[in-house]
Amino acid sequence: GILRTLFIMTKDDEWKDEMEAFYRTDVAVPADLIVDGKLYKDIGLKYRGNSSYFSVSPDLKRSINVYLDHKDQKQKLLGYKTLNLLNGNSDPTFMREVIYSHVARNYIPAFKGNFVKVVINGESWGIYSHIQQYNKDFLEDNFKTRGGVRWKIGAGGGGSGTLRYPGEKKEDFGGFQQRTENAEEAWEELHQFTKMLDEAPIAELDKKLHGRLDVDGALWSLALECIFQDEGYFTRGSDYNLYLDPDGRFHLLQHDGNEVMSIPGGPGMPSGLQGPKLEPFYNADNEDRPLMYKMFQVPHLKARYRHHLKTITEEWISWDKIGPIVNQYAALIRDEVKKDVRKHSSYEAFEKGLVESSSDGRRTKLGLKPFTIDRREFLLNHPEVNLPSPKIASLTEIDQGKSAESYRVVAKTTGNTKAETVILWHADGFNEPYTPVAMHDDGKHSDGKAGDGEFGADIPSQLAGKKVRYYVEARSGGKEMTSDFYPARAEAGPLTFRVKAAKATDSVLRINEIVAENKSVAKDQQGDFDDYIEIVNTSGAKIDLSGKFLTDDDKNPRKWKFPKGTHIGAGERLIIWADENGNAEGGLHANFKLDKAGETIQLIDSDSDGNLILDEIKFAKLETDQAFRRIPDSKGNPSKGNPSPGKKN
């Protein structure tokens, strides 16, 4: 890894006093920043945090927000406009939150984390852990959008932040701190969601949550909080983030993890907790934690949570897995920690905290190594976790996933615990909710013989170019349902395929001619010499091109759509200008240009007609003003030659 140094130069020597005075205000202290030799002018500094502020004297390191966009809204550091510099309060290793983020990002949208050295006005302030800010940059990284609405439910969110329905008024949601500007209408969405969660009968909860909550993501998030003994929704019903995406679905996200892998002393943790022994279903009977209280009463959701808990523990909670990461981090920051005179604990506490637990007589501080080893032992041998379940041994895909075709999947189940129900889950789009399809062991779905433990089902036909995500769930019967998933990470790591466009066998439309570098052949309606594609209708009837597509990318066959009302007459030719100027008035202008070095151009049928490939041309390098055209016209194999736009070749 890389340990970067942030050189901060404040405008005033009294910067600490100013930052104290402006704590929890909108005022930032101005400064300049140098990183990797590059100067970032007019940044802003603010103290952040709660206990990491009040329990620390100003002469020791406090947590700091660095705002790159304090004056210049476009200024960013390596793509990010806000830096969260955390002081390692209550963590002499500085590593807990970075490790937590590293693991969590395998299962949920979670913050990136690393370490930096900070120098202020020429004086070293030592090592800080650096955790990504919960802002629009985070949304873009994880949800591929900058839209939606963000809430933070702080440590003091308590009763009004637990997602229990608090009442009709916005003021009743006092624990929710909205982080998105100009989003008043989102309060009604939150109001309706908490009311639904409060009122929905258990028998209808699954249906009510579909499309309103990322259920699988919420269960992964709860499992992570339990495993790492995090002070979040799982324990205290606060100290978490909530995100409402542009499609109206809520996501339960992590807020911080500075006290994970320990025994936090705040509210919410069970009294008398000794060591890494937080129960896997702690708070499951607590009506003031409605997300768990309700979901854990739905047998298959409780089984899904149990599976996720076990999966994370088996994949990550092992010193063979965590140990090398700890050693790598320690090697990166050890020398600076040793020299750091602003840290809150000793260098000896840093080294000891990696591999040993310690006690001051009042409170035990768990070392990273003993926590990892003992937590794994506790959870994997816990009677609520170590339950027999069906096993999905393998998945077979029968079809290749072309447009206008379904995609058959066969799952083979094994083990002593019979799979009573097997479900194929699928979704298209990056953030779409999954749709369940019942799988059958009846010998009629490519599944061998009836009753042999093989189950088959089809993903319905999808639009060409769509990336389809899917996985399979096998559920047991019995009083305490258990589940298995293939792949094990379910929605956090599904199988995928991209739908390919199938070829039509009777198309009367032809790509007749292309020019990939037009310098003098023909001008478009705007007077520009642009690349062009010529299509010809070889039939004796007028054809409506509305909703059909042109593309130069077989992974995106629906790239440019013919506008509504576009027709081509019998025997006629039509020119489409490939100039990336789709909004130009007059003529047809595609949203891509041609590559004179060579590529493939496809004419794709409409969504309603299955996105079949009506015609395609693959061309090699073309010279300026050279055409690639069919000879004889509209019928022959294409070859290089002289252009004749709008006329017979």
Where are these regions (language model features)?
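Conserved NTP-binding catalytic cores of kinases and kinase-like/nucleotidyltransferase enzymes
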Residues: 1-94, 99, 411, 415
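Structural beta-strand segments of beta-rich domains
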Residues: 405-409, 529-531
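Intrinsically disordered, low-complexity linkers and terminal tails enriched in Ser/Thr/Pro/Gly
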Residues: 362, 366-391, 395, 464-649
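Extracellular acidic, Ser/Thr/Pro-rich low-complexity tracts
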Residues: 409-418, 428-430, 476, 537
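Middle-to-C-terminal accessory/interaction subdomains
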Residues: 3, 14, 23, 38, ...
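Internal "kinase-insert"/substrate-recognition segments embedded within catalytic cores
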Residues: 63-73, 80, 87-88, 106-111, ...
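Aromatic sugar-binding surface patches on proteins
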Residues: 445-458, 572-575, 582-584
